[in-house]
């Protein structure tokens, strides 16, 4: 995994400035760096390398094809590069052992159709020096980031927004996104970012820029298979689930550096641990964050069921309330945009611990809740389907309108704490998401995978891990596994009060009852606890600051009253206070 940057147009950043912009992302690629700068062509490509596969200097980027026509800058991993290389060997003379060269050869041979053959996470750009076409693409689920700015004259892209700003793009506030963040609690749900004019290429998309014509096209979307609800028995589903997951994990272990695992006390994480040890035949380094909290300390539970061998390679990062809050402002610098609170900071500290033990790659258990119906509110959607007698087939529903719930389906902030004029300006447009299925359950899962939960958490984890030069891999988001689980019959996801039914059935003989049977724990409970018991003074100071008082987004009197009630113990949702803190710190760092 690495950092990429590029520019195409009549007004390139000066070469020295372009290189400095690239090097704002040195943390993403501390092992090597390269640049292709051709002012006469109006093209610049830059790269910072984190060496994972083929550690030799032959993997240096930007990477040039044998005939010098194509130039690639690429971030990510193509897990099936070994198989693709065999398929391409008759057409391309390989000179390295990298997946980088395989990716470039695949594009040369198959053009944009190469994307259908790739298994992995990636964001890349290829410059065709003959046709003068810039081709850029992002993996199906948007695991790897791709931000860009295009003013109709010059196109600039990068792995992180900070690099775009360093290239000469002036930071400007996108008030519409600020409104959606405060009013609905949504962020990372669209192509727009908190910076006006800075966009993200959606997952499963590619773009072409030739001349001044920019075209973006989707090449993958779960909605493309909306009639494919699987008819499959529990027995056959178990076998296919096991086979797909084992193959995904096997591919995700392809690496020339050590691979570890982020471990929580949950079912998903422990499923990943079990299968990883089954596939590799050895115990691996695991990393957990341990919180000094009355509500939530997973390490106490993990310690109960790991065996002696596993415990020898289990690394616990002890975290206290003061340490995490002190890091909140630094996390803004890492993320470039508002982020998800104390859990994101805790993850960042865990990745720092992985760096201390020289484990360069970490597997993470993201995605099973979304693809197998694991969240509590999915039960409500499932029950709507049962009442109506639908199994997920049939005509699309159109769009889901989000009115009173935030991104985690918790009650959104009370509207009266927002400035009435600010609300009036932006509420007319509303906020809705494509709902391509007849099933309420599938549409809720689709929303979380394509728009809300997954894009958000993938951005958080990418930036949090890469600041310490750690590569996060997510085996549950192998697109084959995602498609299989998503289109399972609903009864294999939810039965009465049980969720992720198939997973629990598969793992029954492998995972301790203490893991399989426990209720899902919310990290938000820690945030609420610590805000009341540790952060009251800091929060009060920030909300009474001159800069915060000048913000036009708040009804300050109503907000002060609600915050006061929160500190007195009313309500368990602390997200609205986090919105105040996070947005204010971000505005000070990037906009003021």
Briefly describe each language-model feature range:
Residues 8-14, 37, 90, 129-156, ...:
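ATP-dependent adenylate-handling active sites, centered on carboxylate activation for C-N bond formation
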Residues 93-95, 472-474, 550-553:
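A Lys/Arg-rich helix-loop hairpin that forms a DNA/phosphate-binding surface
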Residues 1-330, 347, 514, 581:
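Cysteine-centered catalytic environments shared across enzyme families
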Residues 451-458:
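Core structural elements
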Residues 511-570:
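PAPS-dependent sulfotransferase catalytic core
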Residues 93-98, 113, 168-175, 435-448, ...:
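Structural motif
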Residues 1, 83, 87, 163, ...:
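A general alpha-helix detector
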Residues 35-37, 98-102, 499-506, 518-528:
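Polar, surface-exposed loop/tail segments
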């Amino acid at each position: 995994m690495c950092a990429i940057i590029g520019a195409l147009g009549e007004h390139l950043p000066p070469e020295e400035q372009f290189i400095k912009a690239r090097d704002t992302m040195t943390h993403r690629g501390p092992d090597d760096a390269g640049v292709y700068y051709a002012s006469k062509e109006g093209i610049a490509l830059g790269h910072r390398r984190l060496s994972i596969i083929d550690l030799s200097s032959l993997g240096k980027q930007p990477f040039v094809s044998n005939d010098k026509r194509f130039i690639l800058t690429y971030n990510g991993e193509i897990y099936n590069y070994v198989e693709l290389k065999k398929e391409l060997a008759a057409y391309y003379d390989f000179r390295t052992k990298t997946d980088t060269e395989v990716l470039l050869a695949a594009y040369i041979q198959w053009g944009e159709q190469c994307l259908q053959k790739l298994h992995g996470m990636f964001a890349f750009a290829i410059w065709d020096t003959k046709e003068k076409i810039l081709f850029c693409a992002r993996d199906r689920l948007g695991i790897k980031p791709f931000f860009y700015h295009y003013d109709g004259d010059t196109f600039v892209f990068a792995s992180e927004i900070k690099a775009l700003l360093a290239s000469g793009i002036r930071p400007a506030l996108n008030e519409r996104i600020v409104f959606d963040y405060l009013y609905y609690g949504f962020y990372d749900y669209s192509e727009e970012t908190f910076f006006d004019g800075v966009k993200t290429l959606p997952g499963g998309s590619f773009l072409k820029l030739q001349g001044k014509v920019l075209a973006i096209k989707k090449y993958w979307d779960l909605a493309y298979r909306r009639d494919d609800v699987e008819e499959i028995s529990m027995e056959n589903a178990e076998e296919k689930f096991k086979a797909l997951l084992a193959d995904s994990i096997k591919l995700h272990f392809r690496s020339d550096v050590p691979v570890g695992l982020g471990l929580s006390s949950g079912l998903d994480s422990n499923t990943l641990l079990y299968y990883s040890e089954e596939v590799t035949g050895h115990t691996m380094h695991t990393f957990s964050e341990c919180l000094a909290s009355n509500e939530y300390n997973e390490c106490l539970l993990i310690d109960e069921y790991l065996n002696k061998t596993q415990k020898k390679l289990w690394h616990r990062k002890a975290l206290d309330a003061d340490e995490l809050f002190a890091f909140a402002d630094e996390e803004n610098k890492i993320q470039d945009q508002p982020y998800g609170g104390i859990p994101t900071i805790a993850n960042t500290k865990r990745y720092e611990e992985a760096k201390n033990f020289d484990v360069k790659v970490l597997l993470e258990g993201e995605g099973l809740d979304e693809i197998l119906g694991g969240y509590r509110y999915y039960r409500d959607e499932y029950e709507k389907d049962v009442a109506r007698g639908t199994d997920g087939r049939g005509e699309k529903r159109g769009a889901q309108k989000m009115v009173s719930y935030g991104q985690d389906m918790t009650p959104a902030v009370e509207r009266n704490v927002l400035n009435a004029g600010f609300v009036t300006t932006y509420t007319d447009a509303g906020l809705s998401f494509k709902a391509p299925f007849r099933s309420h359950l599938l549409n809720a899962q689709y929303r979380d995978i394509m728009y809300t939960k997954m894009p958000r958490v993938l951005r958080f984890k990418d930036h949090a891990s890469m600041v310490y030069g750690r590569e996060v891999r997510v085996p549950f988001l192998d697109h084959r596994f995602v498609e299989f689980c998503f289109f399972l019959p609903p009864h294999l996801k939810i039965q009465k009060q049980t969720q992720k039914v198939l997973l629990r059935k598969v793992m029954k003989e492998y995972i301790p009852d203490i893991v399989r049977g426990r209720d899902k724990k919310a990290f938000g409970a820690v945030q609420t606890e610590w805000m009341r018991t540790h952060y009251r003074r800091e929060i009060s100071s920030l909300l009474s600051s001159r800069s915060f008082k000048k913000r036009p987004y708040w009804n300050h009197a109503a907000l002060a009253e609600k915050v006061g009630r929160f500190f007195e113990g009313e309500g368990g949702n602390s997200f609205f206070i986090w919105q105040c803190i996070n947005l204010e710190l971000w505005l000070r760092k990037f906009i003021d």
